[in-house]
């Protein structure tokens, strides 16, 4: 993980304020600054514009505690959407029958948090074999989905990875998104590590296919010099998550609920309370600047290439895969 002086200052200030920002009415600054910095990040990393709060659509971003939380939110939201949709088209089936048929997909190179999300969601996740280059592609996903559909199972979500833990491999988002659209399967992209490189034009290929994904997460506490915990998550249609997680007791209601420009982020996450994480992001960006953060990422990539050359010159070592970003 990474950190920096501005981030530490922001963390101290947030702790001092003691904000529990589960809704706008609790702390307007907490909610509104998070909306601002999530759109800043979206402009900085350049995923599709529909992920911004400022867009005309229902998309937007939220800060989760970790990639594990972001993936779990996506898996649970996709599950509830699939159950509602399938029961509408198959009213003869009970809810328990539908839930018993659900299945999800990911690569055998994906992070352990994805498999854990399946356990917590009570939904099996099939870990599909990646190719020799450690990449999961659409034809592999298609074969698995067709097999499950033939067996009466209900495909729900595919969790792809940009920057796998073992080799920093990048799943083929373009081919996976085409298959997911065909079978109406939610596509989530876990870019916890590689997402920081979206900001570099020389790494723009990593952004291919993101215009067709449903949700995306990226850890600022990796490349962005923001201390743990701080994981950005963007949703193409935030209403799908809100509809899945909305538990609105009378003591949580306020008169400004439902206004598009002031979201209640408690509906976008697992816990009720939430920390003022946006403050350390804001201070870090204001202090270091976009170009300073880009140069930090570039420096990591350059150091990895230098280390790779040292390894290649030493016969005692063997590279499992070519270096990618900061991983050798």
Curated annotation (Swiss-Prot):
The active site is at residue 111. One of its GO terms (cellular component) is cytoplasm. It comes from the Eukaryota. Disulfide bonds: none annotated. It catalyses: L-dopa + O2 + H2O + H(+) = 3,4-dihydroxyphenylacetaldehyde + H2O2 + NH4(+) + CO2. It is an enzyme of class 4 (lyase). PROSITE patterns: DDC_GAD_HDC_YDC (PS00392). One of its GO terms (biological process) is catecholamine metabolic process. Belongs to the group II decarboxylase family. This is 3,4-dihydroxyphenylacetaldehyde synthase 2.
